[in-house]
């Protein structure tokens, strides 16, 4: 898919991620100058393809409609193959599939076609409540959302998501978001963005100074590298910096960390910090610098905090 684009700073996406529940805090978000919200949408049916809508889907759809009615543009994020949850009392993680068995065996054309049709349905069902931008799945390069599925299944499911969305709206602008810029992430992204893809942008999440070492200025190199590699506008699907939290003195023993649980979530401390530490003042300065970078970078589509 060839993309020709040019964008003024005032036209770029200024968004925020509400991955779970907005709690109706629309006025507070508007005070930030936010125009876009990223909201999750789940698989629609609980019994069969084009069957009975699940309660979870109905609730997610209503939240997107309510958010749009409040004057926001919504970027829907489609479901990954699944996700891990953590039971702290048991000290164990549990994997939850997001596509029911009736969608088909993963890796088969039946599965991919049902994914396409599911996404087409979602796109048409949301209608004008969904903005032109879509995020296909979430951070498919890390086990939290991919478990041990093969790379080709992850990549082809993401491609099928975009193809289905564009069946519902040929003008839709789709992309994925890798969890960070590293060798493993771009290896999988290369499969997603191979010839014949239906994507408009390349997306990436980075939390320099919190989840990764560095500071806001490290975004410049990531934006440059991803644009050079994929020749598509780059969206910062997630970014930010924590205003609180202690710094861990050492990494935990990998053997003790449950599968699918990030080390940060296990120890409940950060392994990185920007100069000045995790404070509201450092956070505010970090955001000022980050927003300036996204506004000025010629290949950046915008960002979601």
Residue ranges and their predicted role:
Residues 37, 76, 119, 130-132, ...:
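Aromatic- and acid-rich polysaccharide-binding/catalytic face
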Residues 29-33, 68, 127, 193-195, ...:
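Non-catalytic positions within long, well-ordered alpha-helices that form the structural scaffold/packing
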Residues 236-239, 257-305:
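Substrate-binding cleft of secreted/luminal carbohydrate-active enzymes
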Residues 23, 47-50, 57-58, 87-199, ...:
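Active-site cleft segment of glycoside hydrolase catalytic domains centered on the general acid/base Glu
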Residues 4-6, 11-15, 35-38, 71-75, ...:
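Structural preference for beta-strand elements that scaffold enzyme active sites
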Residues 78-82, 180, 304-305:
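Short, solvent-exposed turn/loop segments enriched in Gly/Ser/Thr/Pro and often Arg
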Residues 7-8, 30, 62-69, 158-171, ...:
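Surface-exposed amphipathic alpha-helices with a cationic face
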Residues 1-112, 203-208:
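N-terminal substrate-binding region of glycoside hydrolase catalytic domains
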């Amino acid at each position: 898919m060839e993309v020709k684009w040019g964008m003024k700073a005032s036209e770029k996406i200024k968004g925020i991620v509400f991955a779970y529940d907005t709690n109706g805090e629309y006025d507070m978000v508007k005070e930030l100058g936010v125009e876009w919200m990223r909201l999750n949408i789940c698989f629609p049916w609980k019994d069969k393809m084009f069957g009975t809508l699940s309660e979870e889907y109905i609730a997610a759809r209503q939240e997107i409609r309510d958010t749009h009615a409040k004057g926001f543009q919504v970027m829907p994020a489609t479901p990954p193959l699944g996700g891990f949850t953590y039971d702290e009392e048991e000290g164990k993680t549990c994997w939850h599939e997001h596509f029911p068995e009736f969608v088909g065996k993963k890796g088969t054309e039946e599965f991919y076609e049902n994914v396409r049709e599911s996404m087409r349905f979602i796109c048409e069902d949301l209608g004008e409540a969904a903005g032109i931008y879509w995020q296909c799945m979430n951070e498919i390069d890390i086990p939290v959302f991919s478990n041990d599925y093969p790379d080709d299944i992850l990549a082809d499911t993401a491609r099928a998501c975009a193809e289905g969305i564009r069946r519902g709206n040929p003008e839709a602008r789709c992309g994925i978001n890798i969890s960070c810029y590293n060798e493993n992430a771009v290896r999988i992204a290369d499969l997603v963005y191979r010839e014949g893809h239906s994507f408009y942008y390349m997306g990436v999440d980075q939390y320099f100074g919190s989840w990764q070492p560095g500071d806001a200025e490290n975004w410049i190199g990531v934006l440059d590298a991803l644009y050079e590699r994929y020749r598509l506008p780059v969206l910062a699907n997630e970014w930010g910096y924590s205003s609180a939290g202690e710094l861990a003195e050492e990494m935990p023993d990998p053997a003790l960390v449950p599968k699918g649980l990030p080390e940060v979530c296990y120890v409940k401390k950060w392994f990185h910090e920007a100069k000045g530490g995790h404070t509201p003042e450092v956070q505010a300065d970090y955001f000022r610098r980050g927003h300036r970078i996204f506004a000025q970078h010629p290949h950046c589509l915008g960002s979601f905090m």
